[in-house]
């Protein structure tokens, strides 16, 4: 919400200083001036947040004759997630503005963002459409997009989107943050004793889960050691005793699922905690072997105890009884 409010203030301040309306922004020089004001605050938001990208995209474009609708603005990404080395790059925006601040264009850079691939653009506006006063917009006006692949990128991402609305309620654009699958894997790695722990996050809906298959998801592993992300579609089946079997292109997992709803955004999510089936089978075999050894040991101890008891206690008693019996027989004969 802070990013949305600050972006609206920066936009309206620039419009007032330039003496123009928002509808007159569709000019390269004016858009460059506005991006110059936005880029440093946006970079600070990105550096402070645990995410892989941050953006401010406007309901304005310099390419009105483009074949596909685009929107001007800034979209910054983090190149590397180490705390002491976080390079910021320009994914969308005017390159001269970025270079002036030491931010170089991404190798898949484009000037503007295609509106049809920024998932949730229209929905972000519709959620806040009835609030003419932005200060009265509730927190649930933000939303998470589906997990998808950004144009030109190789990995999947999810966006948290908020509408930008002026003091008069006018829709100025959208802003928010990006979480890529590699960023998710780093932030949510777990401390565990499992050799090959794997965690999944996905939407519990038809666009991400096709019947008994998981189509699109984020994954994470243990915070130490090697981690290999599951590949392809994961087919889900019942393994018994509340355990699920998940079969991928190159591995099979066993795990458990938990579903939950986000009341503020209306999203339904599902998390899976899994381990390799081969690890489970190995652990199960180890348990069987240990149980057999324990049974054999207990049996041997029982036999040894019986032998010891018979020799130490039972044999003398029987010998005494036998002696008494012989004594009685001699007494009767005498």
Where are each of the predicted segments found?
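Extracytoplasmic/periplasmic sensory segments of membrane signal-transduction proteins
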Residues: 1-132
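Extracytoplasmic/periplasmic ligand-binding sensor regions of membrane-associated signaling proteins
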Residues: 94-176
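Conserved beta-strands of PAS-like sensory domains
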Residues: 152-190, 268-279
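A short, hydrophobic, proline-anchored segment that marks a local hinge/packing element in signaling
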Residues: 158-168, 254-265, 316
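Short, hydrophobic beta-strand elements of compact beta-sandwich sensory domains
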Residues: 173-181, 246-287
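Intrinsic low-complexity, intrinsically disordered coil/linker regions enriched in small/polar
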Residues: 182-266
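Cytoplasm-proximal transmembrane signaling helix
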Residues: 202, 270-328
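HAMP-domain connector/hinge
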Residues: 329-334
């Amino acid at each position: 919400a802070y990013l949305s409010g600050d972006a609206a203030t920066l936009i309206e301040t620039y419009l007032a200083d330039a003496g123009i309306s928002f509808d007159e922004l569709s000019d390269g020089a004016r858009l460059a001036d506005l991006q110059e004001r936005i880029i440093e605050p946006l970079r600070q938001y990105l550096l402070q947040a645990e995410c892989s990208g941050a953006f401010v995209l406007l309901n304005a474009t310099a390419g009105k004759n483009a074949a596909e609708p685009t929107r001007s603005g800034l979209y910054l990404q983090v190149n590397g997630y180490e705390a002491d080395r976080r390079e910021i790059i320009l994914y969308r925006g005017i390159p001269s503005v970025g270079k002036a601040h030491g931010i170089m264009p991404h190798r898949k850079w484009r000037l503007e963002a295609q509106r049809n691939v920024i998932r949730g653009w229209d929905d972000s506006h519709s959620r806040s459409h009835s609030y003419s006063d932005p200060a009265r917009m509730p927190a649930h006006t933000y939303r998470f997009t589906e997990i998808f692949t950004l144009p030109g990128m190789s990995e999947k991402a999810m966006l948290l989107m908020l509408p930008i609305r002026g003091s008069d309620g006018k829709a100025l654009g959208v802003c928010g943050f990006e979480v890529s699958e590699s960023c998710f894997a780093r932030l949510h790695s777990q401390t565990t004793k499992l050799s090959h722990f794997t965690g999944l996050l996905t939407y519990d809906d038809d666009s991400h889960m096709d019947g008994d298959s998981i189509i699109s998801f984020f994954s994470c592993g243990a915070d130490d050691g090697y981690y290999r992300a599951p590949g392809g579609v994961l087919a889900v089946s019942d393994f018994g005793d509340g355990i699920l079997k998940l079969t991928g292109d190159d591995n099979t997992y066993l795990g458990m699922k938990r579903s939950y709803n986000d009341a503020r955004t209306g999203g339904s999510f599902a998390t899976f905690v899994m381990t390799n089936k081969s690890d489970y089978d190995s652990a199960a075999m180890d348990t069987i072997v240990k149980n057999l050894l324990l049974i054999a040991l207990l049996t041997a101890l029982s036999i040894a105890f019986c032998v010891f008891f018979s020799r130490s206690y039972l044999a003398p008693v029987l010998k005494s009884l036998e002696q008494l019996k012989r004594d009685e027989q001699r007494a009767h004969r005498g």
